[in-house]
């Protein structure tokens, strides 16, 4: 399953896994892993979509993970009942290509976010994800202005309820033609919106592909960053020696900036034991 498929199926029913339950793989009496506490660990549910959410939440809790993210409203209570947060929720059933960079999209997007912001606040969901949308021939300055026009209309409600709208930085090779594909562009948009309730979702995997210089850019733009995603490059798999980024150094740099938000694991496990891979990558990032 991909992010595109997950967003596109937001209105669908919960996945039911046939065969042997994952609970047998998780165990019933594992003590919770003690982590250092410098990083608030989260994980994207779509990467583990074949594991029933309740069982996945139990496994995450035992690993010391604090949040399962990129969930629809119907799933927020499930993770809350497991003692976890949902660090990032969805507000609209529109996917990545249709975003705030086109004025004709604003009516639906604003209505969807205005309706979801109070619900997110009530459920303790601190962030709602949004996207710029694809260029489709639009220049970057026009796209930025259009995004700012739409996002500014949401800021009074976001500020009232204490919910942050985060726009994800994506590479425009895998997500062909996506407009918010550079940190500098996203930061300039942040200045234009002018509210602490608009921030960027800095995806390390995507920005390594687009511009590299990950640590320096995190330091430079940290005031605009409200959430962080991981992923091995190339391939978006585990954060280990099979890929080019040295995640302990990146996490150390993030901690030194004073960043207090979540770091969400968004790699797609290549190993058969997905939960073991997740636990290993959490430990790699726990500096």
Predicted regions and their residues:
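Active-site-adjacent beta->alpha loops and helix N-cap segments on the catalytic face
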Residues: 76-80
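Active-site acidic/histidine proton-transfer and metal-coordination neighborhood
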Residues: 10-22, 35, 99-199, 209
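Active-site-proximal loop/turn and secondary-structure-junction residues that shape catalytic pockets
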Residues: 47-49, 72-74, 92-94, 134-136, ...
């Amino acid at each position: 399953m991909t992010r595109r498929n997950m967003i596109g199926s937001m209105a669908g029913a919960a996945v039911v896994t046939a065969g042997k339950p994952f609970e047998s793989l998780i165990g019933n009496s594992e003590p919770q892993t003690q982590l250092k506490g410098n990083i608030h660990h989260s994980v994207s549910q779509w990467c583990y979509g074949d594991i029933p959410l309740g069982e996945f939440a139990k496994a995450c809790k035992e690993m010391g993970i604090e949040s399962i993210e990129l969930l629809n409203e119907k799933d927020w209570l499930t993770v809350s009942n497991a003692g976890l947060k949902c660090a990032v929720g969805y507000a609209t059933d529109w996917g990545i290509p249709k975003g705030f960079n086109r004025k004709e999209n604003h009516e639906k997007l604003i209505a969807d976010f205005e309706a979801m912001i109070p619900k997110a606040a009530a459920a303790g969901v601190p962030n709602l994800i949004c996207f710029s949308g694809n260029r489709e021939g639009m220049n970057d300055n026009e796209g930025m202005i259009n995004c700012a026009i739409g996002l500014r209309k949401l800021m009074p409600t976001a500020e009232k309820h204490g919910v942050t709208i985060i726009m994800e930085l994506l590479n425009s090779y895998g997500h062909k033609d996506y407009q918010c594909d550079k940190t500098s562009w996203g930061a300039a948009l942040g200045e234009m919106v002018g509210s602490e309730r608009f921030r960027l979702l800095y995806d390390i995997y995507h920005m390594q592909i687009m511009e590299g210089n990950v640590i320096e850019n995190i330091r430079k733009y940290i005031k605009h960053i409200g959430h962080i995603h991981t992923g091995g490059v190339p391939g978006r798999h585990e954060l280990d020696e099979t890929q080019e980024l040295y995640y302990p150094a990146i996490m150390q740099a993030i901690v030194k900036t004073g960043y207090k938000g979540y770091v969400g694991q968004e790699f797609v496990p290549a190993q058969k034991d997905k939960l073991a891979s997740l636990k290993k990558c959490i430990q790699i990032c726990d500096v």
